[in-house]
Amino acid sequence: VKRPMNAFMVWSQNERRKIMDQWPDMHNAEISKSLGRSSQLLQDSEKIPFVKEAGRLRLKHMADYPNYKYRP
């Protein structure tokens, strides 16, 4: 069972698609670095919808898998 996405992953999922559409030959490592830099520039107010969605996903995950324990 996968862990629920955190706020960064929720945000980066859509942003990654945008970057891949613009630069289809860009390597995944470069895309990840770009996403990391971009996320640091976001204002707290811009992060709110992604934090809320991550919280919703976490609650859904807890309901779907009540006995789930993360074991790396």
Swiss-Prot record:
> Its Gene Ontology molecular function terms?
DNA-binding transcription activator activity, RNA polymerase II-specific; RNA polymerase II cis-regulatory region sequence-specific DNA binding
Compartments in which it is found: Nucleus
Q: Does the keyword Signal apply?
A: no
The record's Gene Ontology cellular component field reads:
nucleus
- What broad class describes the main subcellular location of this protein? nucleus
Q: Which cystines does this chain contain?
A: none
Task: Give the DNA-binding residues.
Answer: 1-69
Q: Which GO terms describe its biological process?
A: brain development; camera-type eye morphogenesis; negative regulation of transcription by RNA polymerase II; neuron differentiation
Superkingdom classification of source: Eukaryota
SUPFAM superfamilies per the UniProt record, alphabetical: HMG-box
Keyword entries, A-Z = DNA-binding, Nucleus
Name one matching Pfam family.
HMG_box
Recorded protein name is SRY-related protein MG44
